[in-house]
From Swiss-Prot:
The keyword Transcription does not apply. The lineage of its organism: Bacteria, Bacillati, Cyanobacteriota, Cyanophyceae, Synechococcales. InterPro entries: Ribosom_uL1_bac-type, Ribosomal_uL1, Ribosomal_uL1-like, Ribosomal_uL1/biogenesis, Ribosomal_uL1_3-a/b-sand, Ribosomal_uL1_CS. This is Large ribosomal subunit protein uL1. Binds directly to 23S rRNA. The L1 stalk is quite mobile in the ribosome, and is involved in E site tRNA release. GO terms for cellular component: large ribosomal subunit. It comes from Prochlorococcus marinus (strain MIT 9303). PANTHER family: 54S RIBOSOMAL PROTEIN L1, MITOCHONDRIAL, LARGE RIBOSOMAL SUBUNIT PROTEIN UL1M.
Amino acid sequence: MPKLSKRITGLLAKVEDRVYQPIEAIQLVKENATAKFDETIEAHVRLGIDPKYTDQQLRTTVALPQGTGQSVRIAVITRGEKLAEAKTAGAELAGDDDLVESIGKGQMDFDLLIATPDMMPKVAKLGRVLGPRGLMPNPKAGTVTTDLAAAIKEFKAGKLEFRADRAGIVHVRFGKASFSADALLENLKTLQETIDRNKPSGAKGRYWKSLYITSTMGPSVEVDVTALQDIEEDA
C-alpha cells in the first residue's frame, strides 16, 4: 500500500468519523483544499437504485445558481443558418458533416456536445466514440435542441448534465474552493432537490444511501442528507 504524504495524513486527521451538518462539511472541505490551485468541489451520491433496469436510471440536468467556476467548451453539430447562431451564442466549435467527421476520428476538443434534431441520425453513428465519454447529445439533457442560443447560454452559466453510473452513484462538481461556503451550500441544495425531483419510478426502499463531498486533492466528508433536505429553499 502506497505511503500517504504528510499533507494528506494531516488533512485526514481533521476529518472525524461521523456525519457532518451540510455547512459544517462544506467549511471543512474548503479548509482542506490546500493545493496550489483552485480545487474543484465535488459531490458523490450513492443512491438506492440499480441502473441496469430502465425504470431505475437517473439522467438529468441541474442549473447551479452559483455556477461551477469552470469554463465549458461547447461544440455544436448543426447546419445552415444555425451554424452562425451557435457561434454567435458562444460555441467554441460549430460544424456539420466536417465536425461529425473529425469527431469520428477522435478529435474531441470540447466538454459538451449539442446537436439540432435534424443532425441526430449522423450523430447517432458516433455512439461508439461519444457514448463512453458521456458526450452523446440527449433530448432529456437539453443537448438536442433547435434553440441553440438558449442552450449554450444555460450550459455556459452553470447548467450540468449528470447521471448515475452502473453502481448507482452520481458524481457532480458543484463549485470551487474559492466559492463562499454559502454559495457552495446553495449549489449543493439545488443538486439535492434535483436528485429528489427526478427520483426514478422504479426506485425501491431507501433512495439516498450516502452523500460525500470532497475537493480535488482533499479527503471526503460525509454530509447529513436529511439535514440538507430540511434546509429551506431560500437558505
